[in-house]
Amino acid sequence: MSKPYVVGIDIGGTNTVFGIVDARGSILATGSIKTQKYTEITDYVNALHEELSRLLAQENVTDQIAGIGIGAPNGNYFNGTIEFAPNLPWKGVIPLAQMVREKFNIPVTITNDANAAAIGEMTYGVARGVKDFIMITLGTGVGSGIVINGQMVYGHDGFAGELGHVIVRRGNGRLCGCGRTGCLEAYTSATGVARTAREFLELRNDESTLRQLPIQEITSKDVYDAAVSGDKLSQEIFEYTGTILGEAFADFIAFSSPKMIVLFGGLAKSGELIMRPIREAMEKNLLAIYKGKVKLVLSELKESDAAVLGASALGWEAS
């Protein structure tokens, strides 16, 4: 009988979360360690091995794991590496899949976190059975995973699909964390929304409840709360953000003709505040042959579970 469980590991800049998952996408148990606590990769892998082994033993499934999937910033599917991830404590190229495989003697697959989210959506979520879609994660950054004909698009080197870093404002665009200017992420991530709020408040005289807050401490949640309460400036910030996203989505559709675009992450939970301007700008800018054909949908995976589920879906692939 094939082994009934896989392990999903989601590596974030602050925490690493892992879980034991069955083929239906039910999470048996989860655990975590502090990513930032370990400045040496060997110490990190040792801690991960210790905590995950404890969880497997606790659930009495140590010998029932088919594979391990890892989602990580700048994870390279082809090489099994994390490469030059700016928000992780280990620099350069880290052969993480090999290191974890040697600890557990179980097949290991790694990819970037947005690709893992797309695979999770395709395996357990709203994109199940959909062969062509784009996953967009709207959080601190903007990530993406592209699926064409049922296959993740990795490109020749494993780094295809960095749609958060397409240029949407040329010339005098905002500086992005990647070092370039004008990237989609600089405008439409949670930090981008907060930055738009600061710019609007500094450049305009509109009344806004946001003016009651220290300007440098304003967050995207502050903007959302104000918008829901009827603050016109905050609503305009969402309009601005959604329009940029919708225009970008129209371009994305032109090169892959997806059946749907799936949105996930904190900003996506803003509902129609963000969905309406995205939808309107996307349809307005679509080539005629694509109009009315592409669904814009929200992920159905629980945010607390999605990262582990996405990574776990890779575990079945590894097995």
Predicted regions and their residues:
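ATP-binding/phosphotransfer module of carbohydrate and carboxylate kinases, centering on a glycine-rich
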Residues: 1-67, 77-79, 98-108, 123-130, ...
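Acidic/histidine-rich catalytic cores of soluble enzymes
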Residues: 118
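Hydrophobic "anchor" residues
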Residues: 27, 82, 152-153
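A cytosolic small-molecule/anion-sensing beta-strand core signal
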Residues: 72, 78, 148-149
